Amino acid sequence: MLLLGLLLLTSALAGRRHGAAAESDLSSKFSFPGAKEQNGVQDPQHEKIITVTSNGSIHSPKFPHTYPRNTVLVWRLVAVDENVWIQLTFDERFGLEDPEDDICKYDFVEVEEPSDGTVLGRWCGSSSVPSRQISKGNQIRIRFVSDEYFPSQPGFCIHYTLLVPHHTEAPSPSSLPPSALPLDVLNNAVAGFSTVEELIRYLEPDRWQLDLEDLYRPTWQLLGKAYIHGRKSRVVDLNLLKEEVRLYSCTPRNFSVSLREELKRTDTIFWPLCLLVKRCGGNCACCHQNCNECQCIPTKVTKKYHEVLQLKPRSGVRGLHKSLTDVPLEHHEECDCVCKGNSEG
């Protein structure tokens, strides 16, 4: 009997160990790559420092053949001379896993400015070769990431060379990058774009996909609200005539307002530049008040929030800070004609 009990206990323990192993295998099988960090180079434990004294190159593993899966590699190029720049030129043979919705989410190569953490660009796919990149100091960082699916070929190869900065005359405003333009000049340029994709591509031609992904990443902030207009009842012709007078006299109507002027903000740019709001407008020719002059004023005002893109210069850092923000605007819900001078109360 004792021997039988020991055999049963041993069998139960073995079953528990097997179940735990199966659960571990199952959880690893269904783990998703989306949980890994997406922006910037945040893997210093993987970083390989390369001292740059002459021209050279780095490349994805097995280049120009298919690179391995589940790989994270980070290189930091450091020039010995602190007064030089590092130029990166991508080999014409470039191919990584294709983007999803024009955004590099899975396999990509990314270049970062170590001095301020600015991501200069993220690239994937094979439709075009990334443009040349130049550091603003004597260091630059490169990061390569591949997930567990769909490795591609040939990968990438980046040739690096040293550049000696040469000082020239100050560039004209037309040749400056968008982030270096005066806000008033940039505001005029921003006004010409009809979609947010065109705007972000103009501001960040090499990293616009990454910025767009960050911009639309879900947050807990309050979303802008819409408002609804009720239909007017029309019974007979006289009522119709009277209603038309009411509609086109002192009533809430669409007005476009400049956000910078409305919010009295000269330190930032909003896109779109203008929004539609409801404001009282029209005349008071048929004012029912016994006075010589009537004016149209709001009798019910509400504040509504609208989600817009905000562009703000970074203090001491190159580039613009881009974020989705809610701006409060007044909307006139109801209006009335009152005697001029009696609008208070």
UniProtKB/Swiss-Prot annotation:
Tell me the leader sequence span: 1-22
Q: Which domain of life is it from?
A: Eukaryota
Q: Which Gene3D superfamilies match?
A: Cystine-knot cytokines (2.10.90.10), Spermadhesin, CUB domain (2.60.120.290)
**At which residues is glycosylation annotated?**
55
- What pairs make up the disulfide bonds? 104-124, 250-294, 280-335, 287-337
Q: Name the SUPFAM superfamilies on file.
A: Cystine-knot cytokines, Spermadhesin, CUB domain
Major subcellular site: secreted
Keywords for this protein = Cleavage on pair of basic residues, Developmental protein, Disulfide bond, Glycoprotein, Growth factor, Mitogen, Secreted, Signal
**Gene Ontology cellular component terms for the protein in this record:** extracellular space; membrane
Post-translational modifications reported in the UniProt record: Proteolytic removal of the N-terminal CUB domain releasing the core domain is necessary for unmasking the receptor-binding epitopes of the core domain. Cleavage after basic residues in the hinge region (region connecting the CUB and growth factor domains) gives rise to the receptor-binding form.
In terms of PROSITE patterns, this protein maps to:
CUB, PDGF_2
Q: What does this protein do?
A: Growth factor that plays an essential role in the regulation of embryonic development, cell proliferation, cell migration, survival and chemotaxis. Potent mitogen and chemoattractant for cells of mesenchymal origin. Required for normal skeleton formation during embryonic development. Required for normal skin morphogenesis during embryonic development. Plays an important role in wound healing, in angiogenesis and blood vessel development.
Subunit-structure text:
Homodimer; disulfide-linked. Interacts with PDGFRA homodimers, and with heterodimers formed by PDGFRA and PDGFRB.
Q: Which family is this protein grouped under?
A: Belongs to the PDGF/VEGF growth factor family.
- Name of the featured protein: Platelet-derived growth factor C
Q: Species name for this entry? A: Gallus gallus (Chicken)
Q: What is the lineage of its organism?
A: Eukaryota, Metazoa, Chordata, Craniata, Vertebrata
Q: Name the gene.
A: PDGFC
